[in-house]
């Protein structure tokens, strides 16, 4: 973990594998975690990015999400860093 950020590489995973991995990381995230960075890439299409936004956009532990300018990373914001 890097200063409150957990990172997960999702390359090669399907939506089911992605859900299992992200749910586990959300359970693991402690009080010191304020952001989960999910690296899904963009050359293989937008299926994982779209899934993450749909599945976790209204998750009770996720305040909001950010997509990187290139579309290859989604960050789940669990709490604002102050």
Feature names for model-found ranges:
Residues 1-82:
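Long, charged, low-complexity intrinsically disordered regions
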């Amino acid at each position: 973990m890097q200063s409150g950020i957990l990172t997960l590489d999702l390359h090669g995973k399907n939506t089911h594998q992605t859900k299992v991995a992200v749910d586990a990381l959300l359970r693991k995230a402690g009080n010191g975690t304020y952001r989960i960075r999910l690296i899904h890439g963009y050359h293989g299409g937008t299926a994982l990015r779209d899934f993450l936004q749909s599945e976790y956009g209204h998750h009770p532990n996720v305040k909001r999400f950010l997509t990187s300018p290139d579309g290859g990373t989604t960050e789940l914001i669990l709490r604002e860093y102050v």
